[in-house]
Amino acid sequence: MIIGIDIGNTHIVTGIYDNNGELISTFRIATNDKMTEDEYFSYFNNITKYNEISIKKVDAILISSVVPNIIITFQFFARKYFKVEATIVDLEKKLPFTFAKGINYTGFGADRIIDITEAMQKYPDKNLVIFDFGTATTYDVLKKGVYIGGGILPGIDMSINALYGNTAKLPRVKFTTPSSVLGTDTMKQIQAAIFFGYAGQIKHIIKKINEELNEEIFVLATGGLGKILSAEIDEIDEYDANLSLKGLYTLYKLNK
């Protein structure tokens, strides 16, 4: 058994893989940099017991993190409870892609590394555009296995919270698919504008990428809220909720 831990700014998503690399369970908890290795093990142990998954023999623990100060907690978790050294995703690993000349990859996120790794595993011969709808939304573009650029914009929840946090009376709303672009009350108007406005941003970004590349592209999406948006954006060819966790295992196998 292998454990994959994808640490984001908002959530920590854990995947449990069988010996063939198939995901057999996933669970999500809020990111908390005050949590100890013992507290995390308590979460982990309870959830695996509930799902009747034995964790007596763990061969490897894989960690991707965009929150550097939490990594050490999970290294302690791996050593204390499973007697293994965690494998940490970074640019020192063997990667299935290269960076184009002129790309400054300093600070390139582990989340983007594993997303690209899995996308390349699935579609090695395609020009790829990968959207990850997380705390921030990122997009990465690869041409024949070469990373040529991308972008970062505020995430959907970040946009909602900014509107709520910087106004006196506007409510915090849930991100959902509205029935109309014309909201009939304040809450529905925010939901409509956020949904269709964000979808419009993504459509336009894809349009501009198409214009710059002038070649056929394949667009993948992942991230918690990506599923809702992908249904609205015809330009997205595929949504994979577990792209990151799959990429974490694929990168591990590539470097084994």
UniProtKB/Swiss-Prot annotation:
This is Type III pantothenate kinase. Belongs to the type III pantothenate kinase family. It is found in: Cytoplasm. The keyword Kinase applies. GO terms for cellular component: cytoplasm. The keyword Cell inner membrane does not apply. The active site is at D111 (proton acceptor). One of its GO terms (molecular function) is pantothenate kinase activity. It catalyses: (R)-pantothenate + ATP = (R)-4'-phosphopantothenate + ADP + H(+).
